[in-house]
């Protein structure tokens, strides 16, 4: 599971677009902590720190201890906004973590030992991934960093279902039969190209024969006219 990380913040007295712009001019981004049957708390966090955390991966599955002026709050990111052009973080929403609470999070799926899968290594198959993340409903302090899928021994035609994953009991929000990935046979590109070329050649030959027949028919008609 992900370790709790510390995040320094500053409490904000003012909210709104003007206040948010002022925060960003100071090298920070506005954020809010909500939930837990408490009033929302407006805060500001360092832009560089926020950008590093977001782009490092696993941001929305990490529990943070947010220290805003000595007031510490455990919370988990629920959403964030990025500038559509620059990708710079603009705002973050945090959900308070309280005892007995569960949260729904998307946990990444990592595939390991691909070089030990005969269907891929020896037979040239391809791993077709249907689910890059799985949605879990779990206690915040039990969120796994990632779900590993071992491909060792896998053959072409094998299908990996959600029921094959090692997940905390009762946490998966989908169906056990959901396909996570499967191993596809190699595509024979050369054969496809040859078949296409043969079809083109056949069509061209048919067109040539048709043109020749029309020319012969026209010549015969001209000959008959001259003899008449």
Swiss-Prot record:
The keyword Aminoacyl-tRNA synthetase does not apply. Signal peptide: none annotated. Residues 209-228 have a biased composition (Basic and acidic residues). InterPro entries: Rbsml_bL25/Gln-tRNA_synth_N, Ribosomal_bL25/Gln-tRNA_synth, Ribosomal_bL25_b-dom, Ribosomal_bL25_C, Ribosomal_bL25_long, Ribosomal_L25_dom, Ribosomal_uL5_bac-type. Keywords: Ribonucleoprotein, Ribosomal protein, RNA-binding, rRNA-binding. Residues 196-228 are annotated as: Disordered. GO terms for biological process: translation. SUPFAM superfamilies: Ribosomal protein L25-like. Belongs to the bacterial ribosomal protein bL25 family. CTC subfamily. PANTHER family: RIBOSOMAL PROTEIN L25/GLN-TRNA SYNTHETASE, ANTI-CODON-BINDING DOMAIN-CONTAINING PROTEIN, RIBOSOMAL PROTEIN L25_GLN-TRNA SYNTHETASE, ANTI-CODON-BINDING DOMAIN-CONTAINING PROTEIN. Part of the 50S ribosomal subunit; part of the 5S rRNA/L5/L18/L25 subcomplex. Contacts the 5S rRNA. Binds to the 5S rRNA independently of L5 and L18. This is one of the proteins that binds to the 5S RNA in the ribosome where it forms part of the central protuberance. This is Large ribosomal subunit protein bL25. The lineage of its organism: Bacteria, Pseudomonadati, Pseudomonadota, Alphaproteobacteria, Hyphomicrobiales. The gene is rplY.
